[in-house]
A protein has these predicted regions:
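Histidine-acidic metal/acid-base catalytic patches
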Residues: 2-68, 190-212, 216-317
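Active-site acidic/histidine proton-transfer and metal-coordination neighborhood
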Residues: 13-23, 33-38, 60-66, 96-103, ...
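Active-site-proximal loop/turn and secondary-structure-junction residues that shape catalytic pockets
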Residues: 50-52, 77-79, 110-111, 147-151, ...
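Flexible, glycine- and charge-enriched loops at secondary-structure boundaries
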Residues: 58, 83-86, 90, 121, ...
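Glycine-rich, proline-tolerant flexible connector loops at the mouths of alpha/beta enzymes
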Residues: 74-94, 148, 152
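A short acidic, helix-capping loop that chelates divalent metal ions and anchors anionic groups
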Residues: 79-81, 112-117, 151-155, 220, ...
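Catalytic-core regions built around general acid/base machinery
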Residues: 89-99, 164, 168, 226, ...
Length: 317
C-alpha cells in the first residue's frame, strides 16, 4: 500500500459501527494529524427563537437571516402554522428561503412520540407526521424530536424509548424528514447526553442522530467531555449559545442564554472536539434572551453570527 493510499484508507475510518456511526473511532496516526486543517469546517444556521420576542412573520425572519449572512435557518413549526393560517403558501415560503440562499437545516416542533399512554402516543405520531409534512414543503430535511410530554417522568424504560424512537425514525424515513433526538437538560427523561446516545444507538436505525445544545448539556449536567466519544456523524445540527456563571445550573433557565463567547461555556473544547470528531454540519444559534428580544432583530442576528464565528475562530485558530 502506498503512503497516499494508506492515508486515504485511514481517513475513511472516522467511526466504528453503530446506529448512524454514532461512536468515534480510535485510529490516530501522525500522518492523519499532519494533514492541513480547515479552520472553518462548520456551517452557520439561525434558529428563529433568537428573535422570537420581536414577533416578526416568518417571511421577514427569512429576510433577516439572509441579510445577516447565515447559510441555514431553523424555523419553528408554530411559525409555519401561523404563515399557513394567514393564507401563505408553505411551498412559496420554501422558494423564498431557497432564493435567499438559505437551507432549512432543521425545524422545532412538539409532539408526544415518547409517552407511555398508547392513545396519546398515537396522536403524537400523527402530529409528528403533520409537522414533518410542513417541513418537507419548505424544503426541510430534519425536525427536532425532544422528549416532549415526558419531562416530569424519571421512570421511563430507555429500552422502550429506543423502540419508540425507531418508530418515529421509520415515519420520518417514509416522509423524507429525519427526527433528531434532542437533549433537553431540564427534563427528567433524555435530559443527559448519555441517555440520548443510548436511545439513538439502541434504535439500530441508520438515520438515528442527536441534536445537542450547549445550554442543555450544561443544564442537565452532561459532561462536555462526553462529546469526545461520539462521532461527528451523530450530529447534523448543533445548537450553539453560551451561559453566565450565575445563576447556577439548578436554577438557570433558557432566558439566561447569551451570545457565544459572552459566558462561561467551554466553547473552545466543544468546537475542537467537534472538528476532531468529523462534525461538518451546522452550528445553529438558539437564544431566548429577553433583552435581545427588545433590540433590533437584524442587529441581534448579525451580532449572534459574528460572535459565533469569533468563538469558532478563537477555538480553532
Amino acid at each position: 500500500m502506498t503512503d497516499l493510499s494508506r492515508r486515504q484508507w485511514l481517513a475513511s475510518l472516522p467511526v466504528v459501527a453503530g446506529a448512524g456511526g454514532l461512536l468515534t473511532g480510535t485510529v490516530q496516526t501522525a500522518e492523519v494529524s499532519a494533514q492541513p486543517v480547515n479552520l472553518a469546517p462548520f456551517g452557520y444556521c439561525f434558529n428563529t427563537s433568537t428573535i422570537q420576542g420581536q414577533k416578526q412573520p416568518i417571511t421577514k425572519v427569512v429576510e433577516i437571516a439572509a441579510k445577516a449572512g447565515y447559510q441555514g435557518i431553523e424555523p419553528w413549526v408554530r411559525e409555519l402554522d401561523a404563515h399557513a393560517r394567514s393564507g401563505g403558501s408553505l411551498k412559496d415560503l420554501g422558494k423564498q428561503i431557497a432564493d435567499q440562499g438559505l437551507s432549512v437545516e432543521d425545524a422545532i416542533g412538539f409532539f408526544e412520540w415518547a409517552v407511555d399512554d398508547e392513545a396519546t402516543r398515537r396522536k403524537g405520531l400523527e402530529e409528528a407526521k403533520r409537522n414533518m409534512d410542513m417541513v418537507l414543503q419548505i424544503g426541510g430535511r430534519r425536525i427536532a424530536a425532544p422528549p416532549f410530554g415526558t419531562t416530569d417522568r424519571s421512570d421511563l424504560d430507555l429500552k422502550r424509548l429506543t423502540e419508540r424512537y425507531r418508530t418515529l425514525l421509520d415515519i420520518g424515513q417514509s416522509i423524507g424528514v429525519i427526527p433528531q433526538l434532542e437533549v433537553w437538560g431540564f427534563s427528567k427523561t433524555l435530559g443527559q447526553l448519555s441517555e440520548v446516545a443510548l436511545v439513538a444507538i439502541g434504535s439500530g436505525h441508520p438515520q438515528a442522530c442527536i441534536l445537542p445544545d450547549v445550554y442543555h448539556l450544561h443544564k442537565g449536567g452532561s459532561p462536555f467531555e462526553g462529546l469526545q466519544l461520539l462521532s461527528g456523524a451523530a450530529f447534523h445540527v448543533f445548537h450553539v449559545n453560551d451561559y453566565p456563571a450565575n445563576p447556577g445550573r439548578e436554577s438557570i433557565t433558557d432566558a439566561h442564554r447569551v451570545y457565544p463567547g459572552d459566558g462561561v461555556a467551554p466553547l473552545d473544547s466543544i468546537f475542537q472536539t467537534l472538528r476532531a470528531n468529523g462534525f461538518r454540519g451546522m452550528l445553529s444559534l438558539e437564544l431566548f434572551n429577553r433583552e435581545y428580544w427588545k433590540q433590533d432583530p437584524l442587529e441581534v442576528a448579525r451580532t449572534g453570527l459574528e460572535k459565533m464565528k469569533t468563538a469558532v475562530q478563537k477555538s480553532l485558530g
